Curated annotation (Swiss-Prot):
Cellular localisation: Endoplasmic reticulum membrane
Family, similarity comment: Belongs to the PIGM family.
InterPro entries (alphabetical): PIG-M
The protein's name: GPI mannosyltransferase 1
Length: 414
């Protein structure tokens, strides 16, 4: 029987990514529906503006840090250089998988390290996952972000380097703001790593170690944001951060708020004002339960018990309650799933069926939404009132139940 090693799985994952990339070139050239993500076109256009001495925000719908456009300047050099960004994203995707392998190799359960077979099986959730591979080879930049986040955890857990970990988390928050929800978790995790300044309830969680981490993270965020603001001014702040607080995106959106925001986007200012303060500002208020659960309650419950598993559940909750959800967002929590399953009872024979039901429910609820979205986008059939509305609720309720399973599992209540 063929025995795979960790080196084999890395080489295999690289070859599969190359295969997907080459197929994408063929599909873009010969098929009606293109393989390359529209976001990659936006990134490339923004890079072209930078290359010619203009702001990346001259490209409408570019809502990212200028760093991304700077990274993709070689896209403008013509020929195969137009795929430079995809090479970066594929390499970042692979590096993320390698860091996952390293973190798994450091796990001990009852004093025993994970077996090589288990490490390979768990890391395959990322390295051999067709959804992960498709997203990076189509030209999504999420893998650049996942490298930063995983480097932060690697330096924190494996290397015990507070400054390096804080730097990478700060850079990831600059790159895309949502990783800020990990800051409370890491602060709580580090609360046991030093002598508290004052030994009184709650305040005793603050010590030299987590203050050092916090300061490093904030300095990194401030430095990168300060540089970008000095170059691009308010348009950087608005497009990179403020826009996402008021964003309304009714296409390709699994969110339970999808249909409501779609109809709201069609209202005149007068009609919108008549909705009342809360309903008229729905896109702002939906963040309250989302952040309360993902950035406050879950860290308080689980951060000191198992940091990466806590971050996994945080991210799953954040995506579930987000006002915009696309398939790319699933990448945000998939990077932590191998670590979570390594110590989860859902991976055991006794509870595996519950895990399988959760997986099937997650897939089926997505499939039902995609079916009605396909009818709307490609067949021109209006499915907003019935199909998309109910399938969005189905997806939301399914995710809430799955979240409760994860919480019970980590809380030893299965």
């Amino acid at each position: 029987m063929l025995q795979l090693s960790i080196s084999h799985i890395i080489v295999l994952s690289l070859l599969i990514r190359i295969g997907f990339f080459l197929f994408g070139l063929y599909q873009d050239k010969y098929m009606t529906v293109k393989y390359t993500d529209i976001d990659y076109v936006v990134f490339s256009d923004a890079a072209n503006y930078v290359y010619n001495g203009y702001s990346p925000y001259s490209r409408e719908t570019y809502r990212y840090t200028p760093l991304l456009a700077w990274m993709l300047i070689p896209n403008c050099w013509g020929g195969q250089w137009s795929n430079f960004g995809k090479y970066i994203f594929m390499i970042s995707d692979l590096i993320t998988g390698i860091i996952i392998l390293k973190l798994l190799s450091g796990i001990s359960i009852a004093g025993k390290k994970l077996s090589t077979n288990k490490i390979i099986m768990l890391s395959s959730i990322w390295l051999l996952n067709p959804m992960v591979i498709t997203i990076s080879t189509r030209g999504s930049s999420e893998s650049v972000l996942t490298v930063m986040i995983m480097l932060s955890l690697y330096y924190l857990i494996n290397k015990k380097s507070i400054i390096a970990s804080g730097f990478w988390l700060g850079l990831s928050i600059h790159f895309k703001i949502y990783p800020v929800i990990y800051l409370p978790s890491i602060m709580l995790y580090l609360s046991t790593s030093g002598t508290p300044f004052i030994d009184v309830p709650i305040v005793r969680w603050v010590n030299r170690t987590n203050i050092k981490f916090l300061i490093t993270t904030l300095i990194t965020i401030g430095a990168f944001n300060g540089i970008m603001y000095s170059i691009y001014g308010y348009e950087f702040l608005y497009n990179s951060y403020l826009y996402h607080l008021i964003r309304i995106d009714h296409r390709h959106n699994f969110s339970v708020y999808n249909v409501a925001l779609y109809y709201k986007s069609a209202l005149s200012e007068i009609a919108e004002a008549s909705l009342g303060f809360f309903t008229g500002n729905m896109e702002k208020f939906v963040m309250l339960p989302q952040l309360s659960i993902s950035a406050l309650i879950l860290p308080l419950l689980f951060a000191r018990r198992d940091l990466i598993s806590c971050i996994f559940i945080q991210t799953f909750a954040f995506v579930t309650f987000n006002k915009v959800i696309t398939s790319q967002y699933f990448i945000w929590f998939l990077i932590f799933l191998p670590h979570y399953l390594a110590q989860s009872k859902l991976y055991s024979n006794k509870h595996m069926m519950k895990g399988i039901v959760a997986l099937l429910l997650w897939i089926v609820s997505q499939g039902s939404w995609l079916y009605f979205a396909y009818q709307l986008e490609f067949l021109g059939i209006s499915t907003f009132d019935n199909g998309l509305l109910f399938s969005s609720f189905f997806f939301y309720i399914s995710n809430c139940w799955i979240l409760s399973v994860f919480i019970d599992d980590l809380n030893n209540d299965l």
